[in-house]
């Protein structure tokens, strides 16, 4: 689980500044290089995850205290990364009610606990980079990796608005 957490945060962090470019070939994605020893990068990824993903998506198989694996203290976790609980031993639950999310986005957002493990870091990297502006979609966004995705682009302010030609 420790490497999965690090892969997830690193892939998320690396996806932010990149443009939407995915290798063609049905499931063959650009290779992401992750340095699991770069704790500062992993900590930034954890902050991005809790600020942008945990609003809608739970990670119910992960407890906040596991963030100590990437060098954070209980105090840092409580002060900067916890918004729905005060106990660092609690699981990471979304702030948004799943029923409300289903009504607003067409489906309840999936739990993200095992996404990096089941899909792989390359998929996650491509997915986060794959959002593009699509005026035909209800929320104005689509994704080259997950067509007709119900999720709006959570990191567009960091990544910029991408277009598919």
Where is each model-derived feature located?
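Electrostatic cytochrome c docking/interface patches
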Residues: 23-47, 58-69, 76-77
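Post-cleavage N-terminal segment of exported redox proteins
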Residues: 1-36
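Electron-transfer interface patches adjacent to heme c in soluble/periplasmic c-type cytochromes
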Residues: 72-144, 149-165
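Short pre-active-site segment immediately N-terminal to redox-active cysteine/selenocysteine motifs
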Residues: 41, 49-60, 108, 120
């Amino acid at each position: 689980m420790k490497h999965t957490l690090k892969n997830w945060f690193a892939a998320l962090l690396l996806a932010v500044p990149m443009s939407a470019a995915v290798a063609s070939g049905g499931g063959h994605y650009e290779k992401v290089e992750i340095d699991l020893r770069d704790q500062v990068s992993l900590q930034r990824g954890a902050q991005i995850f809790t600020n942008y993903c945990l609003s809608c998506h739970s990670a119910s198989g992960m407890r906040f205290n596991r963030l100590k694996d990437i060098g954070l203290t209980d105090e840092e976790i409580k002060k900067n990364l916890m918004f729905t609980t005060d106990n660092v031993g609690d699981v990471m639950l979304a702030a948004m009610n799943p029923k409300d999310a289903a009504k607003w986005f067409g489906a309840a957002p999936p739990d993200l606990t095992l996404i990096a493990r089941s899909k792989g870091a390359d998929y996650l990297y491509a997915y986060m980079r794959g959002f593009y502006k699509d005026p035909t979609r209800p929320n104005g966004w689509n994704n080259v990796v997950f067509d007709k995705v119900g999720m709006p682009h959570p990191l567009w302010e960091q990544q910029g608005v991408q277009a598919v030609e």
